[in-house]
Amino acid sequence: MNSNYLLLPHFDPSIFTLGDSNIGLRWYGLMYLLGFVFARWLAVRRANRPNSGWTVDQVDTLLFNGFMGVFIGGRVGDVFFYNLDHFLQEPLYLFRVWEGGMSFHGGLIGVIVAMIWTSYSQKRNFWQTADFVAPLIPFGLGLGRIGNFINLELWGRETNVPWAMIFPNDPLLLPRHPSQLYEAFLEGLVLFAILNIFIKKPRPMASVAGLFLIGYGVFRFIVEYVREPEVENFFGIITRGQALCLPMIIGGAFIMAWAYSRKSAVIK
């Protein structure tokens, strides 16, 4: 082991547990909770602006549905995208949520389903809902990556950069990229800033959602080059995460082009 690199302490992933059980509050769960609290604060603030088109009750319904979408979609996505073999051998693994395992792409699918249902029940345009939700997401994503870092999971590839870190649960104790922190910065702070600056200017409906898909897809695709793959690469070229990001980037670009082609639907 090279002493020139920072050796991280072994963080306890649980803040507390109930007795000898595995049930309790984990840092990762706390990050999700803080992300939703911040999202509600920001959403209510925007809903209270004149002519926002939203009431606080509608926001709460949307966020509750979104929370369920993230939780169910994130868990199912992690199992089917990254741990399908484990699930086929032990189907009850899907329900052991206290062991961790959440997929962003699965959570995104869950949120989209929740937005479709909420838009239908509130009789509003889906893209109005998607544009309202998109700027709320990145801050929570960043906190989630901090949770990954505390859990000492999803670390990066081996490297010799000066800021490399050694994760104590790495059997090889190699200096690695702190890829969780890269993602927290790019997918969290940077994407949050981009979207919340973008919505301050006139723009066509659906453009905010399209920009979110492009921004997340590009940032995640880049970081995947220094993140240790969870599963084998596709054809030895790209990782599973990069393969899942490509449809996001392409879809986001298509949505942006379509949105700007509809010149009459400009939101000020």
Curated annotation (Swiss-Prot):
Enzyme class, UniProt record, top EC level: transferase
Function: Catalyzes the transfer of the diacylglyceryl group from phosphatidylglycerol to the sulfhydryl group of the N-terminal cysteine of a prolipoprotein, the first step in the formation of mature lipoproteins.
Matching InterPro entries: Lgt
PANTHER family: PHOSPHATIDYLGLYCEROL--PROLIPOPROTEIN DIACYLGLYCERYL TRANSFERASE, PROLIPOPROTEIN DIACYLGLYCERYL TRANSFERASE
HAMAP family with a match to the protein in the record: Lgt
Transmembrane segments: 23-43, 62-82, 97-117, 132-152, 179-199, 206-226, 241-261
Subcellular location: Cell inner membrane
Enzyme Commission number(s) of this protein: 2.5.1.145
Keywords assigned by UniProt, alphabetized: Cell inner membrane, Cell membrane, Membrane, Transferase, Transmembrane, Transmembrane helix
Lineage: Bacteria, Pseudomonadati, Pseudomonadota, Gammaproteobacteria, Pasteurellales
Domain of life assignment: Bacteria
UniProt pathway annotation: Protein modification; lipoprotein biosynthesis (diacylglyceryl transfer)
Species for this entry: Haemophilus influenzae (strain 86-028NP)
Chain positions recorded as a 1,2-diacyl-sn-glycero-3-phospho-(1'-sn-glycerol) binding sites: R145
Name of the protein in its database record: Phosphatidylglycerol--prolipoprotein diacylglyceryl transferase
Family per record: Belongs to the Lgt family.
Main location: membrane
GO CC list: plasma membrane
Membrane topology summary: Multi-pass membrane protein
GO molecular function: phosphatidylglycerol-prolipoprotein diacylglyceryl transferase activity
GO biological process, one term: lipoprotein biosynthetic process
Keyword Transmembrane helix: yes
NCBIfam families: lgt
Keyword Transmembrane helix: yes
